[in-house]
């Protein structure tokens, strides 16, 4: 505040001098020269004073945060304790999950990752933060530092609402789509579109083909499925074998929204954010809104207030599953022993593709283990989504009220105390009583009252699609040198590299 007043004073003095020189009928003599030089000297002195005050204020803040802040006793990167620039660098660079793993390996189970934020690495902490609050205890509300972003400020959807009661109402309104009846209807939709997908793959299969970029085509499949479940109609990407403009716009918008949490942490006002945002982002958003409204208007019972909810369901119900399918395809291709075990299980269980259903795949233990292991290695929501501590003990540490706290699913899933050799793809760790693995530490969809509503739908679609593809085809990785995990980045959603696979109709 002092700095701002100093600079305002400089501006007033300089402006006054300019006005006098412009509009007054001065005779240029020694008095005028003296007057002008006095103004310049005053401006320079005030500017220097303002800079000194700024430096002193900054140093005072840094010293307080490093040595006297309530969280000063916790280890972590010094830059993170002093400024939000540490978060901005890791977040906008797409490396956030990997950076968080590194800092926990360096500093331990409790790390200070911002001036007022702690990151925990333990399944106990995860339960303490995310579980239903006991009666009479205050809940861990979602933090403004992450959830006051984008259009959800005015109309918070089920993910961004911070009010537990509002969340309960929204969850209840959407739950019909994910109850037993809703899942039965979803099974038919998934199986129908998966059969079409397998058929389209056959047109691009064989030894003389360049392969299929499964990173793209799995997106087409999952968006077509969720399009039917959300809007009552498919985007026809699989049947036309090309991406829908609606889907392309949604994915591009999601990627560009990466900078919103960074802007929130840097306290950049919304009007300034709009000024620096690329013009194509706002134009694409407007066009996407128009397409969304058109689709919603065709579905009886959906009203305009559900526009944002529809977009959320589209992203959560499609992109996360598509990422899993691409990732597990790569892992199976890189681990031929696991691929062989899965092929043996699926192909011995079914005598025809028509027997592959949601219920029948639920009985395949190795298939389920492959799904769980894939979700552990690259969870759909890998980062710690901050909650506000009401003043509570988290895994033995009393945390002051108002502190942001979080647990990263990616970090827990790669902790060798819970999962030995965490970077190795080992579906066997999910079969039987493997005492070397603490399976509850893997929570790819979170848990508690704010857990993902579509978890059962995601597992259902993953099992059906993987089983069909393994049953119908032998797979061949085109780019043998591809290191898929080194190329993935997180920009709101997982940004995945191309993954070309040559499919061969299997010998029956």
Outline where the language-model segments fall.
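Cytochrome P450 heme-thiolate monooxygenase catalytic core
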Residues: 139-151, 185-323, 341
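Cytochrome P450 I-helix active-site segment
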Residues: 187, 191, 245-252, 331-380, ...
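N-terminal membrane-proximal hinge/A-helix region immediately C-terminal to the signal-anchor transmembrane segment
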Residues: 1-169, 191-200, 221, 273-279, ...
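Short, small-residue alpha-helix embedded
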Residues: 320-333, 465
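C-terminal helix/juxtamembrane-tail motif
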Residues: 1, 491-508
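Conserved cytochrome P450 K-helix/beta-meander segment immediately N-terminal to the heme-binding cysteine loop
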Residues: 407-434
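Cytochrome P450 heme-binding "Cys pocket" and the immediately downstream C-terminal segment
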Residues: 75, 199-200, 336-338, 431, ...
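Cytochrome P450 heme-thiolate "Cys pocket" and heme-binding signature region
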Residues: 156, 172, 176, 311, ...
